[in-house]
């Protein structure tokens, strides 16, 4: 049923995930909110749907939980025809594989465990945040004072030892007691917090 709805030209498909999740995988026809934090998602989606209150809206997310909350919010805001992908991308990927169907979702499904992603199709739709090469491998910077989540290709990973910059590579190579000083330095931590990838 969702497959038919997603292909309907009168349907607005909304990705209810943060940009770092959707940049590695998404439904082809989806509108992607350009937000980095979950708290900003609902206001942004409401803004995106302004003037389309009578459209059919389909929501999707990783496992379905965020869509439950979002659909209640949107219905309360006057958008009455809201549906969601039951079980999220996880269930969708399982179902299409089981039934041998072509996936309308391309790329990886970002997951919140050590894997940081489950491949749904072989498509790579994102690029390395450092050099622009095709890549969909999320990493946490190995400099624990930074620890930013970013996408890195294998060449940049090798060149920077899993760090997001030369500065972080230098810090990550220090003895652990020296690294701890950076973690405790609030000025350094605040500076890293606002790192923006070229993708964003």
In which residue ranges do the predicted regions lie?
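Conserved small/polar residues in nucleotide/adenosyl-binding loops
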Residues: 1-5
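Short hydrophobic beta-strand that contains or immediately precedes a catalytic carboxylate
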Residues: 12-16
